[in-house]
């Protein structure tokens, strides 16, 4: 049967932790309410249980091969931009620069998984580690049938984020200006970001099998006024 698919794209954590234990993560500043803080995702959701919005939900466990594939997808695109091989952009080709390969981070992957386990397609408010701030890209795909091929899901998500390059102004590489339409791309190629970790969940929503992907990035990119990556 032919599958019906839809895509929804957003902007710019798996061992159980007993809720009786004090959460080891620090809260994050609430920028909308100075002096207040947001509770960390791992403290809000102290177990790996799926949230009540996860109708017929299941966690998609990433194998070591899946993790390496996520790195491959990201690092091939980062290398392409670094070499000056990206001709797309709203103001011309992207400049070559220094963009190193990403490594996998189990901690931020666990935080990403804990968040997608809630089956809520929006960004969590507090996901930083003790070492770094953490950025995030989200992707959601729906189908009339269950999606079983994890590599296809991962390919679609990373390629969707990167495709925003066509709208990215190359002048923002040296002095970053956040745009909702290109925030995924800039996080994928952000030069100071060194690690990535992702989580996936599948659940049923409005008759569709919905797969949600969250990839967390450390240190976070998309710093307004910062350098996306050093140009050559």
UniProtKB/Swiss-Prot annotation:
Family indicated by similarity: Belongs to the CRISP family. Venom allergen 5-like subfamily.
Record protein name field: Venom allergen 5
Tissue specificity remark: Expressed by the venom gland.
Domain of life, source organism: Eukaryota
PANTHER family for the chain: CYSTEINE-RICH SECRETORY PROTEIN-RELATED
GO cellular component: extracellular region
Pfam family, one: CAP
Disulphide linkage map: 28-43, 54-119, 198-215
Subcellular location, principal: secreted
The UniProt record lists the keyword Secreted: yes
Signal peptide as annotated in the record: 1-23
Keywords: Allergen, Disulfide bond, Secreted, Signal
Location of this chain's protein in the cell: Secreted
InterPro entries attached to this UniProt entry: Allrgn_V5/Tpx1_CS, CAP_dom, CAP_sf, CRISP-related, V5_allergen-like
Domain SCP: 71-217
């Amino acid at each position: 049967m032919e599958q019906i698919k839809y895509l929804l794209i957003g902007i710019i954590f798996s061992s159980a932790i007993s809720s009786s234990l004090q959460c080891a993560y620090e809260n994050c500043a609430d920028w909308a309410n100075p002096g207040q803080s947001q509770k960390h995702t791992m403290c809000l959701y102290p177990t790996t249980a799926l949230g009540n919005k996860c109708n017929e939900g299941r966690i998609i466990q990433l194998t070591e091969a899946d993790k390496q594939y996520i790195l491959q997808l990201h690092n091939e695109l980062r290398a392409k931009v670094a070499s000056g091989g990206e001709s797309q952009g709203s103001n011309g080709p992207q400049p070559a620069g220094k963009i190193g390969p990403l490594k996998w981070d189990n901690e931020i992957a666990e935080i990403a998984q804990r968040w997608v386990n809630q089956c809520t397609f929006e960004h969590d408010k507090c996901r930083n580690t003790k070492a770094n701030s953490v950025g995030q890209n989200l992707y959601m795909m729906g189908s009339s049938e269950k999606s079983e091929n994890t590599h296809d899901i991962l390919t679609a998500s990373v390629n969707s984020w990167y495709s925003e390059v066509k709208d990215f102004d190359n002048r923002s590489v040296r002095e970053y200006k956040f745009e909702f339409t290109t925030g995924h791309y800039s996080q994928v190629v952000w030069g100071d970001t060194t690690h990535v970790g992702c989580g996936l969940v599948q659940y049923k929503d409005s008759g569709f099998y919905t797969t949600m992907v969250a990839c967390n990035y450390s240190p976070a990119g998309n710093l307004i006024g910062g350098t996306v990556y050093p140009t050559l």
